[in-house]
Amino acid sequence: MNKIYSRLAFTNIKNNKTLYMPYIISGMVMIAMFYVMMFLNNSRGLSKVPGADALASIMGLGCGTIAVFSYIFLFYTNSFIIKRRKKEVGIYNILGMEKRHIARVLSIETLTVALAAIASGIIAGILFSKLMIMFLYRIINIKAQINFTVSASAVVNTILIFGVLYFLTLIYNLMQVKLANPIELLRGGNVGEKEPKSKWLIAIIGLGCLAGGYYIAITTKNPLQVLSLFFVAVLLVIVGTYLLFISGSIVILKALRKNKKFYYNKKHFAAVSGMIYRMKQNAGGLASICVLSTMVLVVVSTTVSMYVGMEGELKQRYPADISVYSWYKEIPAGLKLDDALKEAEAESDKIIDGSDCDIKESKSYTYFSWTVCREGEEFKPVLNYNNDISMLYFVTRDEIEKMEPGLQGRLKNKIPKLDAGSVAVYGTEKFNNDIINLLSKEFKVAAAEKTAVSQDSYMSSMYSGVYYVVVDSKATLAEIFNLNSSLGEDSVPTMLNNEIDYNLYGSSEDKLAVAKALDKHFEENSVKSDVSGFYVESRDANREQIYVFYGGLFFIGIFLGTMFLMVTVMIIFYKQISEGYDDKARYEIMEKVGMSNDEVKKSITSQVRMVFFLPIILAACHLAAAFPLLRRLLVMCNLTDVKLIVICMCATLLVFVAIYYIVFKITSRAYYRIVGNQI
């Protein structure tokens, strides 16, 4: 008896290979991708690279994302298959098979599919794991010997997670058979449908959600809110997309039908009436295609932008090859800031002169900064970080050009001469008062202009406004700094910084050696000096970590983008099959009411194209609306090249549209095979 059930199960899979082969292949790819991600997450070699913790977090995020989307997608695909097979199951029931016998056949089918997908997926994952780790090493610029290994924990986790998934699909299938009577099963997916109603309220809510998501993406400027509101905007756009496809499309089509002049035209009559039913059946799937397409565009374009602009990001974050910082919590009595800075610079120059590097250029300056909240024309201490916070940089007139190169060239008026009681204020927003109050001491504002600020863009991206308060001398600078210290518990946490920046001639290895020598020297001598602390920052020392982090993001972006694209392709494929079965009957009906074969073909082909290209059009709109928010997120990652971001996004969109069109044309073959001689 068991042999009969097994033979019947294998025959069913073979007879429905058009449905099952894509299901097994997509499951295999999902499983292979999950195994590879688990393998990379557990890799001992990757645990030794600089920035390994960040890379592990990225890989962990990838594992979770693949698992979640695998469950969603494979459940969707399974539900489509079981819906199409209900008639077949109903015939078995009518012919005398009890539901428990049908359940046994379905169990064998599910077990066969699961074993085929899991086994082939793990084998493919193992075979491709070395290739993927080589690709990752190439991206993150790591040179290391790679041995072929198999991760036992990755294999076990993959079997457990996807074994549970296929078991849940079996439970779903058995429930569908158990709860349906034979007549319902025989009707399968051909149950008569009523004309969908115009649900204005749902359509308006959908439009409101979409408008709300767009508004947040376009108008959010507070850096502290960008990340949190990004997810709010994403949620609103997803909800809005589904509601608009489900209800908004019906509302628009019915409004067109009410326009008698438009509707009673042979070009529009069949198309509009057909689209009403077509959108009712396909709205959810089309919304899913739209959301997944948007995910592909956003994930790939942003990670590509970050990876391509990596050197620019590195130079933006670390403008000099080597920077030496020393700071003071309080200025010691009798300390002359100029003397302390010159002494530190002389010591640094001596160490560099004794190395294999030569000084290309250097600069040194003293400054301190305050985190404040601007209320009108006043700057007040930050009480909480929910406010729009700003950064004030205090620096002398003689050293402002060192800290902000090109500032004087950008100003309409040159920085005026200042005295001990006057300052100049330059920032991302203009300061309009003639007097500025700094910790209860008033200063006359000799000049104030709005100008671009590039200093420390990594930090600047976190603030709503960045301002330079330019003073006449270091004596005034020290006076204002000491005013802050005198406030006790009410003081604004800050440090007075001496910074020395070097650009050097020499190899990366030589520059790293200089940075280590400087770090060692100042660590040994910091106890003897009056400084509160110091550190040495090297662009080359941080290059590896930057490459690992952004390279890891690029890798995961391409990986997830590929997965989202595959899911999109499979949904399009199954939608084409669904359209084919539905349109086969539509062709017959439309020909019976007097339409010629050419008219029928033209009408239905235009409907199918409209249905399948609506998602990509709306996805492009989503990407355009998301651009301002994505740009701010990328600025927080030091990518300030807007032109590069636009080029990467446009290139990603063009490539995706081309792939989408090719997929549509290829999957259309399945549609035309089903429709057959009707066309």
Regions found by a protein language model. Name each.
Residues 76, 84, 176, 222, ...:
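Juxtamembrane interface at the cytosolic side of transmembrane helices
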